Amino acid sequence: MKTRTTYSGLVDETFVGQTVTLHGWVQKRRSLGNLIFVDLRDREGLVQLVFNQDNADILALANTLRNEYVIEVTGMVQARDEAAINPDMKTGKVEVIVSELTILNEAKNLPFEIKDGITTSEETKLKYRYLDLRRPEMQQAIIRRSQITQAAHKYLDNNGFLNIETPDLTRSTPEGARDYLVPSRVYPGSFYALPQSPQVFKQLLMDAGFDRYYQMARCFRDEDLRGDRQPEFTQIDVETSFMSAEEIQEQAEGIIKQVMQDVMHIDVPTPFKRMKWQEAMDRYGSDKPDIRFDLEIQDLTEMMKTSSFKVFSDTANSGNLVRAIVVPEGAAKYSRKMLDEQTEYIKRYGARGMAWVKVVDGELTGPAAKFLKEQEAELLSALSAKDGDLVLFVADKFQVVCDSLGYLRKHFAHDMGLVDESQFAYLWVVDWPLFEYDEGFGRWIAAHHPFTRPNDSDVDLLETDPHKAHAQSYDIILNGYELGGGSLRIYQRDIQERMFKALGISPETYEEQFGHLLSAMDYGFPPHGGFAIGLDRFAMLLAGRDNIRDVIAFPKNSHASEPMTNAPSRVAPAQLDELGLEVEPEVEKD
């Protein structure tokens, strides 16, 4: 096999008159008798090959080529005739007149075409993932991911960070999701856990004096899957010592700025906008707001305390909220049926319903209009609602109102075409609550993780009013997605123990699970903090994809299985015996 001169997709006018050797896959063959055209594909794109009757043996061999045959060709690059130029191809101004052809491998009939825009099922594409990855859009998505990691390495290496690996086999600790457990053959009955994050280890590296750490960390969480989640994922993981929260955020911005410059050729302005958690919830109904469009939530609670609309007044006077969004020019676009569908949809957030009115000729119309007649002028003024606008109301508890209106503003903004899809809007959400109440557990849990440092002024609230305490934490948001986040960490043993107790973790439990971390705090643990950026999600957004599976070479499906290798799978009884394990037989359900 000859050495390749260049990639097929890079052959342009600068190669005219040169002899090149190319390797790749046959995308398409077109035969015109004594002339055969072949599109040769590799990761950089396509180039047109020409086989003519100057070499009858090669022409005959070219006639046997089929889609996805792997070939090697050598030939002269020439400019195409003006009429033959293809403006849709990067290499559309040139072609290669082939003088040598070698078939390196053949291909059977394919389960689907190797091209973009196919309608093949996701399961089939995952079963033949190696073929799916040949499609140009998938190649570009994976390449985009590689470019992001290269840019991140570049920034971190140039700014004094040390690339240090942490263990993938560690002990099981509660971090929110279920652990993936690995049985130990050497210690029967004992298990390792795959890390949900390198959190404790990277903090211990700070105690060891490696004040600027990073790695492309592999993380594992046994949780229910959504479109932007996988059981195994990668994060750009960073930890530093002796930095303020603002200085740490500057490092995260530096990584993102480098990535945007190198990968997207966009210079994003820094520092990024900062918004407190409470403001984000009040204005956008979300702790990860998409700020590319307005449709901000407006509070009508005080006004509605005196409303004759009993649903609103009762809600407002019971300590709950009445809030609304105005959809500009939405009155004519949305029918009652369409709005009823959205009313039904937000019930999944706990909402009892959604009221709506339309502004027509300066007056309110619609089902709720008659109940708001007395306050019509005041309401129109407060909302700055104009003719043709649609107003949506939700009255309920804080979280229900936020979740419902947060969803509605995104839904209607996208449906109305109000979102600039070409924009990358970065935002820091800061000043988070330290705890959040988990209805399922019936207790307070850490909003981020139990190592997050409280605001200095809130430490004493750990024992008295934990729900009032705020954290020195920060999330980085991109276009309504949580791209990553971090915090300053607790570095004093007494505060860490108080944090554990506030979470309902007994001294016996936290000593058993985190004794090594607490012990380290007795030996001069420095102030420290850090962050992690989700590489998969970052790549998904920069590649313009809707699912992180598209930027992972070999992902799991929505059932956490992998159709290509049929993982997970049963193992041989001898392997179970060696590990001292016994699998209970499946019981058929009635």
Swiss-Prot record:
SUPFAM superfamilies: Class II aaRS and biotin synthetases (SSF55681), GAD domain-like (SSF55261), Nucleic acid-binding proteins (SSF50249). L-aspartate binds at E175, R221, H448, R489. Keywords: Aminoacyl-tRNA synthetase, ATP-binding, Cytoplasm, Ligase, Nucleotide-binding, Protein biosynthesis. Pfam families: GAD, tRNA-synt_2, tRNA_anti-codon. Its EC number is 6.1.1.12. GO terms for cellular component: cytoplasm. ATP binds at R221, D222, E223, Q230, E482, G534, L535, D536, R537. One of its GO terms (molecular function) is catalytic activity, acting on a protein. InterPro entries: Aa-tRNA-synt_II, aa-tRNA-synth_II, aa-tRNA-synth_II/BPL/LPL, Asp-tRNA-ligase_1, Asp-tRNA-ligase_1_N, Asp/Asn-tRNA-synth_IIb, AspRS_core, GAD-like_sf. It is found in: Cytoplasm. It catalyses: tRNA(Asp) + L-aspartate + ATP = L-aspartyl-tRNA(Asp) + AMP + diphosphate. Catalyzes the attachment of L-aspartate to tRNA(Asp) in a two-step reaction: L-aspartate is first activated by ATP to form Asp-AMP and then transferred to the acceptor end of tRNA(Asp). Homodimer. This is Aspartate--tRNA ligase. It comes from Latilactobacillus sakei subsp. sakei (strain 23K).
